[in-house]
Amino acid sequence: MNNLLIEIGAEEIPAGYILPALTSFCDRVTAALTGARINHGKTAVFGTPRRLALMVEDVQACQAPQKTTLMGPPQRIGFDNEGKPTLAGVKFAEKAGIVPEEIIITDNGKGPYLSAVIEESCLLTEAILEGVLPELIQAIPFPKSMHWGDLDVTFARPIVSLTALLGKTVLNFKIGNIASASFVFGHSFMAPERFELESADAYLDTLRKAGVVADIGERRTILKESIKAAADKACATIIEDEELVDIVNNLVEYPYPVVGHFDEVFLELPDEVLITAMREHQKYFALADTAGKLMPCFIAVNNTRARDMDVVAKGHGKVIRARLADAQFFYHVDLESTLDDFVEKLKAVTFQASLGSMYEKTGRLVVLVEFLAGLVNADQELQKKLMRAARLSKADLVSQMVIEFTKLQGIIGRVYAQKGGEDPEVAMAIEEHYRPVYSGGDLPRTDTGKILAIADKTDTLCGCFSANLIPTGASDPYALRRQSIGILQIMLEAGFDFSLRALVRRGVAQYQTDPDKKNEISTQILEFLKGRMTNMLVDQGFSREAVNAALSVSFYNVPDAFLRIKALDILRQEPDFEPLSTAFKRVVNILKKAGGDAKTRVNVNLFNCDAEKALHQACGEVTERVDTCIKAGDYGAALKEISTLRPHVDRLFEDVMVMDDDVALRINRMALLSSVAALFRNIADFSQI
């Protein structure tokens, strides 16, 4: 068996395209190999701005053999009474590619039928790949693709070379006017010539000698080590930014860092502005001293090693100075206005075409934070902070700085609020209310920030659902899934035990006045939130059964629902959980068949056996203890108390016919089971486990 190498050489591919393209290409090729019955080993992908490559180990030389059974007509039609094949039998043999003597009689359950075992021919892997690779390569998805020349070919950037080797054998195919070959191109500036590959295995070493590190992980390690060495030489530390490392890593074929400088006068700008300007426009790494204070220098990573790197450093410094001069100008222009001035300008900024302006959204946020303040029993000081933070929360969207650097929204609002003398918590809330800005990101730390963040996300959710802008499949242009999870995470982390239902209904009321429509949209949103909470907790490691069982009872109190799920998930690990669950499921199922819980109280005078009396007495004793546990939020203890009822429930089912012909006895026994069901129904629906 040989290793398979496929490399697509191209003009500069955008950094963000590389990893998704490699993942897709790998999936498509392995699926094609599997579908063609070609066994193979591990896969590895490699990529730079100038190449996308895939290596598949231990690829079988040809398809695995496969036998299939072809069924024909019944035996009575395929053969005559003398056992000779009829015309139908002969035709079947011809169709199967066999002689009549090779026909097999098979009983398929409907009687004897003609059949034939066909062994499919095994094609060479080389031939199969040559046929499918052009299509697989052109099927790689990109955010944007392009045509070039007069060719009927699309790709992220023009394809300049194709390398395809199965061991030492070249796989021959063409895409457009580019034919596959056994060579690769080296570094586009330092070794642009062709390098012949003796085999697929020589790929990485050949490229290393040609100035290219194609292994993304290896190149990333070299990048991190080299920028650290450059920072150490400048007596500085790098401002950590792993995302920027990934971006820069896919901008170069080999990293060559250099330290550049800018004028100290720009250090008057907020750190976030300096870092963002260097990062977003130039992909530079900001540097700080040992105390964490930004220094007037940075690291730029080049794709080539120049003869005089000092000249390169000066060039980078000249470029960033122009960027920082613009930022400094915008900063000073913004400081001539107050955040309250900016609020008025929000009237001209559209939130969403169907949902009004950002000024109107600000008004809704003020209403929602006031409502939330009541739900969390906020004191007057917190209420005041919330109202002010809500009013100023979107003000920086019209600032010159955010127009230039959109990622600074909230951050620059916090900076301007601090400079304007706002309460520190109000200023911080302006930044925090966007959190989490990505899945797994930091949550707000201040109470004002937490409540404002919930209000903002709730308003967006209610507005989009009211305008029928509901996520479908992979499409979620307003990030409603992320915002929903943000609401749930903040409520859970902060221990906010107010009713999510009350919050959603208040949010929807700002968009809908019709009661029926309000109820319909609120129900949709709550189901959406329930789905997000289910996925969130399953991702955290809780069993889906435990999550569904607990949330089906209620999820409006998020911290309470989490405690119930946690307790139930722990109980599920106990060895005697299965019989316990079975007993309680039986209780639920009997009640369901009878049309639900009994509407009458238990009448002890109707008990006619010890099992009824024992269960009733135990249930009464347990109920009191369970209520105490639930009030304390100790659902683990509550479930343990409830589990003590299992022997009594089992005994009742063994000794008593619940669905007795005597109506009075039947109703009384249903009432007894209803009292048992009421205990665990406060925690979870055991029928879903």
Curated annotation (Swiss-Prot):
EC class: ligase
Keywords from the UniProt entry: Aminoacyl-tRNA synthetase, ATP-binding, Cytoplasm, Ligase, Nucleotide-binding, Protein biosynthesis
Reaction it catalyzes: tRNA(Gly) + glycine + ATP = glycyl-tRNA(Gly) + AMP + diphosphate
Domain of life the protein comes from: Bacteria
GO cellular component term, pick one: cytosol
SUPFAM superfamilies referenced in this protein's UniProt entry, alphabetically: HD-domain/PDEase-like
Entry EC no(s): 6.1.1.14
Principal subcellular localisation of the protein: cytoplasm
Subcellular location: Cytoplasm
Protein name: Glycine--tRNA ligase beta subunit
Organism, as annotated: Desulforapulum autotrophicum (strain ATCC 43914 / DSM 3382 / VKM B-1955 / HRM2) (Desulfobacterium autotrophicum)
